[in-house]
Amino acid sequence: NARQLMQALVRRVDKNAEHKKSKAAKAGKADVDYPQKFHLYRQTQAQRARILGSILIPFNADYSIPLRRAPDVLAACTEAWGEPQVDGPMIVTSLREIMGVVGAHEWRKKGVDVPALGDPPNNRIHPYYGVFSPVRGEYVDLVLKAPLPKACEVNGSAVDVGTGTGVLAAVLAQRWLSNITATDNDPRALECAQFNIQNLGMGKQVKVVQADLFPDSKADLIVCNPPWLPGKPTSPIERAIYDENSGMLKAYLAGLAAHLNAGGEGWLILSDLAEHLKLRTREELLGWIELAGLKVLARLDAKPKHGKAFDASDALFDARSKEMTSLWRLAAA
């Protein structure tokens, strides 16, 4: 059974990792500080992924699997990879990849309850393959609770930069803003956001458009939840986690003032985990804000509630346990 083989391989890989960790501790090599500790962690995770990706599964061109008792994965594969090439050659992919594809299909089908959008089942966001799921609720709650700028009180306009699933645009619509633009440059994210906005009945309030960051027009409120960690993503889903050279963060700050209406605000939603991992300092962030001609009006903080923040066995627990997610209210200086 392929799944049992994968589970056995996971146990073996994790057992070897624990053995190496214990051996290093006995040799006095465990006291590695950040950011080196984080880089070693990513290296270990990459090695683990490479080993777990070594179990391969054959596919026919129509996405059927020529193995006994193989499941029907046509719908899941079509969502992730596009329509099958019926007359094409047989292909091979890793079991880990296909498990991810099937898992993404289930998330897309069931959806994720977002309390900020009301009561289930009418509050569900359906993430697509390769689009980050809104499983961390604290940043969504910050957007729900932050006081809207006065400029938004009458026919206010808002932009959700890098909308992903469209969840933050939907929260803004839930707050009765009626002129919202949700932008992204990833075709999967655009399709995903469009589906969710229509499914929630918010199509008249929210327009989904393709843009690198900002749309052509100005707005009274511009929200951005960029990837939180400086680093190079190694997969599509990691683009929601890692921001190479803090490129998106810097670009948002640099262009914000020019795209705000008078009296408007920019809301930057950002975790300080990068600071605890020593990948970025608070002084650097404040310097980028000042350099962009912006000022900080206020900051709202929320403690993460996800499992890793409380898991003492996590390799980065000492940093994760101190993490705080903040909504920075910014305005032109």
Language model segments and positions:
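Short, electropositive alpha-helical surface patch
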Residues: A274-A292
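Class I S-adenosyl-L-methionine
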Residues: L286-A332
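Conserved beta-strand signature within the Rossmann-like core of class I S-adenosyl-L-methionine
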Residues: G263-L270
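A short glycine-rich, Lys/Arg-flanked "PGG" loop and its adjoining helix->strand segment in the class I
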Residues: L249-A262
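Conserved SAM/SAH cofactor-binding pocket of Class I
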Residues: R136-C224, P230-G231
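Mobile active-site "lid"/loop adjacent to the S-adenosyl-L-methionine
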Residues: P187-A189, P226-A251
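N-terminal auxiliary segments of SAM/dcSAM-dependent transferases
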Residues: N1-D113
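SAM-dependent Rossmann-like transferase core, predominantly class I methyltransferases
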Residues: L74-V171, R320-K322
